[in-house]
């Protein structure tokens, strides 16, 4: 008997995010994971929370793809910056390097003990424009004084896990999938998809 593959579209054109999602979900019998075409136009993220933005994207792209669609919205919340960059994390500067430099510049005079930060991840799954599942996870850390590590993407090089004294970008893929907000959220998604 031939197993019918179910399709899950990953609603992003960010190659780093696609790699991370595929890695965290691993092989799932009966599922085919597909990314959006690179020329897909992004929609305006008008939500005031990560979950609202994930839901907006999941609803929109599930209608375009005609398939079950996963959307993610995630970002960095820094107490000393009044919660910035927050839902504007991916738009805080023109490119990932500039975003990191902006955060480090704004944190330059902030002493240890006041550099706490939270990385949030919200996932939403939609089918034919309707949300059918959501999850939110976070991880607590601090902003490092300088970038470290070459793994990951985004703010990973400056998001330090104090218990390990390593940034997210210092971690190997397995550790990052286990400890990161996105990794924790994707573990929940995997359970959801395989239980259906």
At which residue positions do the language-model features occur?
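Anionic-ligand binding patches
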Residues: 3-9, 15-196
């Amino acid at each position: 008997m031939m197993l019918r593959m179910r399709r899950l579209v990953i609603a992003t054109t960010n190659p780093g995010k696609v790699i991370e999602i595929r890695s965290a979900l691993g092989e799932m019998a009966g599922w085919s994971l597909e990314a959006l075409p690179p020329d897909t136009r992004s929609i305006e993220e008008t939500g005031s929370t990560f979950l609202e933005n994930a839901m907006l994207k999941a609803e929109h792209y599930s209608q375009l793809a005609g398939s079950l669609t996963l959307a993610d919205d995630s970002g960095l919340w820094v107490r000393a910056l009044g919660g910035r960059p927050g839902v504007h994390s991916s738009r805080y500067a023109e490119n990932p390097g500039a975003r990191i430099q902006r955060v480090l510049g704004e944190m330059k005079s902030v002493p240890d003990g006041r550099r706490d930060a939270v990385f949030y991840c919200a996932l939403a799954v939609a089918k034919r424009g309707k949300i059918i599942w959501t999850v939110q996870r976070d991880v607590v850390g601090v902003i490092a004084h300088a970038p470290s590590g070459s793994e990951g993407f985004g703010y990973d090089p400056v998001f330090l896990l104090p218990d390990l004294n390593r940034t997210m970008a210092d971690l190997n893929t397995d550790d990052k999938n286990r400890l990161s907000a996105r990794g924790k959220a994707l573990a929940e998604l995997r359970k959801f998809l395989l239980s259906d």
